[in-house]
Swiss-Prot record:
Changing residue 88 to S: Decreased IgE-binding activity. Susceptible to pepsin digestion by simulated gastric fluid (SGF). This is 2S seed storage albumin protein. Residues 121-128 are annotated as: IgE-binding. It comes from Fagopyrum esculentum. PANTHER family: 2S SEED STORAGE PROTEIN 1-RELATED (PTHR35496), 2S SULFUR-RICH SEED STORAGE PROTEIN 2-LIKE (PTHR35496:SF4).
Length: 149
């Protein structure tokens, strides 16, 4: 009887977790709203966008930690520069609107997971990515304001 109760409780916890934190096959899209057009673009560019994640992690975290994590996740980045190049490929292939939505998703998904200081550093790095990739400054936001997270 105790075993049944434990198994039933575990099953409910797993079901509740999956309902609360819906996951896509790739990125954790969390509860961030993204247009279907941008969702498609993110999915199509997911391998390269993962390199954006790795680039930012390498920049704000200890390089050895990020390198080990990169190997485990198979991102294929040997350096910050190689991650940035892969990231730029995705950003150049996506509409500006979708790059903006993706950036917002990235920040929203990290809130509560990492410290405030790391969030600020990550936001700074995200804002710099378009210029590092040779793209014009993104105009994100409903009123044409510069991108603000």
């Amino acid at each position: 009887m105790k075993l049944f109760i434990i198994l039933a409780t575990a099953t409910l916890l797993i079901a509740a977790t999956q309902a609360t934190y819906p996951r896509d096959e790739g990125f954790d899209l969390g509860e961030t709203q993204m247009s279907s057009k941008c969702m498609r673009q993110v999915k199509m560019n997911e391998p390269h966008l993962k390199k954006c994640n790795r680039y930012i992690a390498m920049d704000i975290l200890d390089d050895k930690y990020a390198e080990a994590l990169s190997r485990v996740e198979g991102e294929g980045c040997k350096s910050e520069e190689s991650c940035m190049r892969g990231c730029c490929v995705a950003m150049k292939e996506m509409d500006d609107e979708c790059v903006c939505e993706w950036m917002k998703m990235m920040v929203e998904n990290q809130k509560g997971r990492i410290g405030e200081r790391l969030i600020k550093e990550g936001v700074r790095d995200l804002k710099e990515l378009p210029s590092k990739c040779g793209l014009s400054e993104l105009e994100c936001g409903s009123r044409g304001n510069r991108y603000f997270v």
